[in-house]
Amino acid sequence: MGFKKIGVACGVNPLPGLKIKAWLIATGSDLDMEVEVVESAQEMPLEPPTPRIALGDRKIAAFLAASELQKAGCEAVIIPDVRTEPFLPELQKELQVPVISLLAGLPESLKAEGIRRIGLLGRAVPQDFYEKIFGADFEFVKLAEDLTPIYDILQSPGEALKKHGFSPENEEMMMKAGEKLLEAGAEVLIPNCTQMARFAEELRLRGLPVIDLLRNAAVEAVKATPKRLPKPFKVGLIGGLGPAATVDLYDKIVKATPAKTDQEHIKVVVEQNPQIPDRTAALLRGGVDPTLAMFNCAKRLEDDECDAIIVPCNTAHAFLPYLQRFIRTPFINMQQAALDEIKAKLGDKARIGLLATTGTVQTGIYSDKAKAMGLAMFVPDAEHQERVMAAIYGPKGAKAGYTDGVCREDLLSAAEVLVRDGCNCLILGCTELPLILDESDDFEVAGAHMVVIDPTAALARKVVKTAEEAFERTGIH
């Protein structure tokens, strides 16, 4: 015996939802398959003040219900609402769980039966929507003007069908409408109102050739459950360390993305927390440990279903091993991205000079990786390391808003020392340093020509490459 788990957004339209539930179970029984039906009770707000707000209510309620059912592990979802049909593509774009249309498979099956002329029983959705779905092989019978008041009564919110069900008065009105459509040449009738769809069985017993949309969707969901769709790549960014570095990384991701439209850019979620304790202070002076604050950010990004997490702070990477013991989402490592680019540019001939905070230097987050890759790495002597720190933290440094003058002189003096050590490459290993020196493939220092790598830019390029690889696999931005 097989098994299927199907979700129904019953709260959007409770009674039609129950009918779909019954059809799902019955179809499973016919196919010797156990069907677990999961219901969402998400309702639409009452009494929207305008038609546009009513449409927004319907879209958002359908999305909330489908999202809930997706999280519950459903293999497919049915929204028991004819008015939802026109925006199912919008809904599906935001979800991975397949949303089964009430009209699923109908154009093909009706064409196979030789049926060409269709009448719409109700007017919840404009006729041109159906004409687009069914195509040129079908002709829809024009709505007779005298049916409009009948449909208005039957579809009245809180009255008629919704309130009184298949009463003699409602039966008479539906039969009259159906017979009019048949007289006009319709071969079959499609309920263009969810409440009318609810009574398809009763109308068929009275001789009207009404297609049972609720049964149709249930059968399609069980017999031909589509595969869950891949989701677009989404990167999570632990922001706030520092705020300007967060903006810088995001800006570099945008600039590195080869997009021609807004829609081709990468989904980015920023968990901005400037209150994360200072990483350098924690490493060098016994300051407050930032591990929990960083973990909380990473967990939120993981819960938001990010595919990768990035951190726009070199020193913060020293704390990632603690997070990675609990966070399943992979981190794209800034130092590794920078070193991979250097290896690609210079190979084993690379002699790397590291310009970074003393905390970053002491943690070995660069040197340990460089050693594992067989790359030589050097740092300034103590005197010039102090000048690097002054370029970052000093009263005329980058964190104080300066990008030229004393801070640049301090940084270049440290770079000159590294040139004397034979370095042919510099890593700007603090997010403030690219504000002072630009990334370059040919930067002259003390008569030597060097490659200068901005790890933030390298990380941005790695994010874009990872996103492009995901797009090649899924075809989804």
Model-predicted regions and their roles:
Residues 1-477:
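Non-catalytic structural scaffold of enzyme domains
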